[in-house]
Structures are given as structure tokens and as C-alpha cells.
Amino acid sequence: MGVLKIEEIPHYTYEDYAHWEGKWEIICGVAYAMSPAPMIKHQSISNKIARQLDEIFENCKRCKALLPIDWKLAIDTVVQPDNLVICNENLDKAYITKAPKIIFEVLSKSTAKKDEGIKFRLYESEGVNYYILVNPDEKMAKAYSLRDGKYIKIGDFIDEKLTFELNECDKPLEFDFSKIWE
């Protein structure tokens, strides 16, 4: 059996992705199949995150909390964060193009490595202000804040509150982690 050459590996684009069935992401042209359906615990936590983000961003009209939506970073890179906050983005398109201000990824066995590795570096390089990795099994979230182009760990959160400071909002906004584990 011969060795696979780099030029023989498929390089996918958004155009390819737009025609696929099922849930996929592409990062730098590499296709990643997503879990068919998240576990109930994953969905429950994601829904609680979404509700709380909706509430805290109610008074910040320039920002919107969203559930998974395509974020098209390049012709060959499209991801779908579990929960995200966008600001000053056109809401009439099928996907977003600007970096979200906040991203939550709820870890699962099938996505943890990608969320903690390639997506961590991708979100950092794209300028996502806050990245929160939520571990349902440990009931703990690791929060990172972007400082000078690099993520700095803010801390591990179980029942604490995290304050988001965004230029688009008149005042800091507080997220209560104790509410997502109930």
C-alpha cells in the first residue's frame, strides 16, 4: 500500500459544506463530522446558557445571544459554536462572518479534544473576546479572556459569577454559572 500524498487529501470549501446533509464543520478545508444529536445533559446545559445569555443581553441591543449558527471564517472554514454572542452583525444572512464576542462550547466525549485544541487556537486567533469550555460531567466551566491576542485563563467556575465587559454594552454583564447545572 502506498503512502497518501498531501495533494490527494480532499480540501473542502463552504460551497461543498452547503450541500452536505447532517451536521459538519470544516476547519482549514478539513471536514469534521459532528455528533448526530447531543446528549440530553448537553442540550439542557446549552439551553440554560442560551436563556441566561438572552436575559443578560436584553439591555444591550447591539448584541444577540444565539444557539448554533454557521460562522464562516474563510472559504474553507465554517464552525458552529454551541452558544455564542454576536454584536453589530447583519442578522439577515444564513451565517455570520464577524468573530463572536463570547463563545460557549459544551464538551462531550466526541468533541472535547477539538474544542480544547483546534477550536481554542482558532477562536483565539480570530479574536473571540471570551471562550468558555463547559464540562457537564465535572459541572465546571473554564473561562478564558483574550488579552493582547492570547487567551488568559480567568478561572474555573462552578457556582461563581463571571462578568463580561464588552464595548458594545453600556455596563458589565454578569453570568451566573450556578444556574446552568440545575
Segments the model singles out, each with a brief description of its role:
Residues 1-182:
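Gly/Pro/Ser/Thr-rich low-complexity, intrinsically disordered segments predominantly at protein N-termini
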